[in-house]
C-alpha cells in the first residue's frame, strides 16, 4: 500500500500496551488513524475507540483484520493469540505490527515465517522496541566503532519492580527474556548458539509458579558469552542494565536518569518505575517508522525471522531449566526473504 492519505489501522488488544499504542497513535504519530478496535473486554475496547473520531468497536479480531476499511493491523493482545492473528493478517495480505513475542513457541513463529515465504514477501514487523532506544543505539554504535576491540563478554539485567502473583516461569521467559534474546542477536550481528538457564534461591515475593530471579547464560555463534539476570520482583523500580566487555575495554548503558540527589550524606538517583516511561522514545520511534513504511508500501525492522530466532532461544531457556543442561538454540541460515540488502 502506497498512499498519501493516513494509514487506517485496526488495533487488536486494548490492554496496557495496546492502550499505550492507541495513545501514541492518537497524539504522537502523524499519518495514522485508528479506525477499528477489538478487545476481549468490549468496555475496554470502547474506551480506547473513543480517542478516535471514527473508530468502531469490532467484536471479533478476525473480522477486524478482514474489514475493507482497515489497511494495517496492530496486534497487542495476549501472547497466546498472536500467532493466529498474524497468520490471518498475512492471509489478508495486510501489514501487521505484532507485539513481542511473535508467538509463544518457536514452532508457532516458524509457521508465520513459512506463511510469509509462501507469499514471497514480508508483512510482519515484531515489536522489539529496544532496537530503537537511543541508549541501545549508542551502545551498538560504540561496538561498531571498534573502540573496545572484539567483544568477549556481556552482562545484561532486566529488572521489574513487581509482577502478578499468577505469573508462571514459562510466561516470564516468553514475555520478558525474549527482549534480551533479540537484543544480543541485534547487538552482535550474529545468532545464538546455545542457552543455559539457572534458578537459584527464590524471591519470597514471587508467586508459587514463578522461579525468580533467573540467570541465563547465552553463547553466541561467535563465542561471545552473555549473562542475563531476569529479576521480576526487585521492588526498587524498572531497571535495565547492559555492559559489554571487549579486548580493549568496556562499554555500558549510562544511568537512565540525569539527576543526582545528595542529601544527608547519601547520593541518590531516581529509577524509572515502569517500562512505559523507560522506553517511551523507543516505542514512539518504532511505531512511527512502521506507519511510514506502511504508507510507502514497504516492510522493514524486526522481522518474523527475528521473532522466530528470539523465541527459539526462550524455548531453549525453558527447556534448560527443566533439563539442567545447556540447550542448542541456533536457528540455521537466514532465509533469503529476510536477508538485508
UniProtKB/Swiss-Prot annotation:
Query: What family is reported?
Result: Belongs to the Gfo/Idh/MocA family.
**A Gene Ontology biological process annotation?**
inositol catabolic process
Look up keyword Phosphoprotein and say if it applies: no
Q: Which InterPro entries does the protein's record reference? A: Gfo-Idh-MocA_inositol_DH, Gfo/Idh/MocA-like_OxRdtase_C, Gfo/Idh/MocA-like_OxRdtase_N, MI/DCI_dehydrogenase, NAD(P)-bd_dom_sf
Say if the entry is tagged with keyword Kinase: no
- Superkingdom as given in the UniProt entry: Bacteria
- One matching Pfam family is GFO_IDH_MocA
Instruction: Summarize the protein's role.
Output: Involved in the oxidation of myo-inositol (MI) to 2-keto-myo-inositol (2KMI or 2-inosose).
Which EC class, in a word? oxidoreductase
Give the protein name, as stated in the record.
Inositol 2-dehydrogenase
* Reaction equation(s) it catalyzes: myo-inositol + NAD(+) = scyllo-inosose + NADH + H(+)
Q: Which UniProt keywords apply?
A: NAD, Oxidoreductase
Please describe the quaternary structure of this protein: Homotetramer.
The EC number of this protein is: 1.1.1.18
A single Gene Ontology MF term assigned here is:
nucleotide binding
Amino acid at each position: 500500500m502506497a498512499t498519501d492519505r493516513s494509514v487506517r489501522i485496526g488495533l487488536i488488544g486494548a490492554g496496557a500496551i495496546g492502550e499505550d499504542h492507541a495513545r501514541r497513535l492518537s497524539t504522537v504519530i502523524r499519518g495514522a488513524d485508528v479506525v477499528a478496535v477489538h478487545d476481549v473486554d468490549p468496555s475496554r475496547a470502547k474506551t480506547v475507540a473513543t480517542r478516535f473520531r471514527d473508530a468502531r468497536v469490532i467484536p471479533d479480531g478476525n473480522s477486524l483484520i478482514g474489514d475493507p476499511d482497515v489497511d494495517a493491523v496492530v496486534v497487542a493482545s495476549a501472547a497466546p493469540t498472536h500467532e493466529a492473528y498474524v497468520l490471518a493478517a498475512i492471509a489478508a495480505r495486510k501489514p501487521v505490527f505484532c507485539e513481542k513475542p511473535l508467538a509463544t513457541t518457536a514452532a508457532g513463529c516458524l509457521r508465520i515465517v513459512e506463511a510469509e515465504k509462501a507469499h514471497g514477501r514480508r508483512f510482519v514487523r515484531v515489536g522489539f522496541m529496544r532496537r530503537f532506544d537511543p541508549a541501545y543505539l549508542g551502545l551498538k554504535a560504540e561496538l561498531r566503532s571498534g573502540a573496545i576491540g572484539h567483544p568477549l563478554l556481556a552482562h545484561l539485567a532486566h529488572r521489574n519492580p513487581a509482577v502478578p502473583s499468577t505469573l508462571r516461569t514459562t510466561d516470564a521467559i516468553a514475555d520478558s527474556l525474549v527482549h534480551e534474546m533479540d537484543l544480543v542477536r541485534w547487538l552482535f550481528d550474529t545468532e545464538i548458539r546455545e542457552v543455559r538457564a539457572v534458578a537459584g534461591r527464590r524471591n519470597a515475593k514471587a508467586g508459587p509458579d514463578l522461579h525468580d530471579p533467573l540467570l541465563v547464560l547465552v553463547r553466541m555463534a561467535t563465542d561471545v558469552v552473555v549473562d542475563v539476570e531476569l529479576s521480576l520482583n526487585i521492588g526498587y523500580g524498572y531497571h535495565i542494565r547492559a555492559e559489554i566487555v571487549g579486548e580493549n575495554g568496556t562499554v555500558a548503558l549510562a544511568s537512565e536518569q540525569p539527576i543526582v540527589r545528595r542529601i544527608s550524606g547519601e547520593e541518590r538517583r531516581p529509577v524509572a518505575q515502569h517500562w512505559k516511561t523507560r522506553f517511551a522514545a523507543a516505542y514512539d520511534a518504532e511505531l512511527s517508522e512502521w506507519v511510514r513504511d506502511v504508507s510507502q508500501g514497504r516492510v522493514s525492522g524486526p522481522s518474523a525471522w527475528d521473532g522466530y530466532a528470539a523465541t527459539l532461544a526462550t524455548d531453549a531457556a525453558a527447556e534448560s531449566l527443566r533439563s539442567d543442561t545447556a540447550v542448542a538454540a541456533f536457528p540455521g541460515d537466514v532465509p533469503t526473504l529476510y536477508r538485508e540488502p
